[in-house]
């Protein structure tokens, strides 16, 4: 039997997803563009909003929303296959289910040239972020900030965090 959205969200979601879904529903009337910074979590929010709309309004919302994520999450495959990434499969399934076209972008930030081994670990798939880093990086890219500058800033931030940690102080 079908599960009510509210029951599903209460069981496996979090309060922010409900808030973000409400925000998206408000976007329909405000006619404003929105960047959802996240991978599958924000795809879930978009799916909740699309489900709450009548079919005739779904493509309108899809036209206003961009999903932005990191290149690592965009390329991640959860199954041992050489096919499309798990996020791409999820987005295609949403497009088919709701009969919409979705827009998703992956930021170009890579840490392979970082001084910090902790950041280079992203390239090995050892680290997952979940703080909207892809969306923020995309905004910086679209504003013309060179990715090399972002990598240097991230290196400096790790230096500062490590320096504060060695002195027994909490990082700022």
Where on the chain are the PLM-derived regions?
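N-terminal loops that bind phosphate or other acidic moieties
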Residues: 1-172
């Amino acid at each position: 039997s079908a599960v009510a959205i509210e029951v599903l969200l209460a069981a496996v979601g979090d309060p922010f997803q409900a808030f973000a879904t409400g925000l998206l529903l408000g976007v329909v009337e405000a006619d404003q563009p929105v960047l959802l910074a996240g991978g599958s979590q924000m795809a879930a929010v978009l799916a909740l909003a699309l489900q709450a709309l009548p079919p005739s309004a779904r493509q309108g919302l899809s036209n206003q929303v961009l999903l932005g994520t990191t290149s690592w999450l965009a390329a991640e495959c959860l199954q041992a296959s050489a096919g499309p990434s798990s996020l791409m499969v999820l987005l295609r399934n949403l497009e088919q289910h709701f009969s919409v076209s979705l827009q998703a972008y992956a930021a170009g930030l890579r840490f392979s040239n970082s001084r910090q081994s902790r950041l280079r670990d992203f390239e090995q798939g050892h680290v997952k972020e979940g703080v909207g880093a892809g969306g923020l990086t995309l905004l910086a890219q679209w504003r013309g900030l060179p990715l090399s500058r972002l990598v240097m800033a991230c290196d400096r931030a790790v230096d500062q965090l490590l320096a504060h940690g060695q002195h027994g102080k909490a990082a700022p």
